[in-house]
Amino acid sequence: AIFFASEPGTDAARQAERDLAEQRRQTDARISAYHQGINSLMADASFESSVEASIQSVRQGLDNLDSLRRAVDSRSIAAGDSATRYTTLIMGLVDRIPLIIRGSTDPELTREVNAYYALAEVAEMAGRERAIGASLIRSGDFDLPTLRRIAGLAGQQEGYFNQALAMFASGSELRESLKKGLNTLASQSLEEKRQTLFSSPSGMYALEASEWFTTTTDRIEGLNGIRQSILEELSSLVEH
């Protein structure tokens, strides 16, 4: 979104290109890990047809990722269309989680997978907020519908976060980690930036798109750290 919002040939566009290249590098590393993990799982276990269909759909989407990136680089695809295709790919992964939950008969395992699913939704909504907010700030156009969309994404994140909290017993280590996630420096900084953004046009003009992007990215990385802790706990439950 930031890339599309920047004027080609400007310093902002060059910075957006560098940021995009770094994002892609990180994404490629995660895709490689995903392929290794899913191939290992499929070699050792069988899945019901709905899960297998989800795996195949995501594989096809990842196979088409390079062509989508080329279309973005050449600006031959509209920003909205590219966002839709990226979102569809990501949600293919997120929506697989309920399919897995459906087959679980262990109450504790089900709760933790539900918590992971809720945090995956938080991370997805946070990613959208990152892109839309940075693009809006970069554009300099105070747009109320876009602001309402950002506010809605913030509300959805809070709802899913509360769902994740509800999956853990009071005092549990993972519940405490989740609660701390609400009070990180990145979370506090983002909340301040949200309030500034929503205050008035002058508030929006006081923000920098790069700072919004960095702050939201730091918060997402913190969320992903908590998700990783849940995965490790899930692995322990499955092994025992």
Region roles according to the model:
Residues A1-H240:
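Hydrophobic alpha-helical segments
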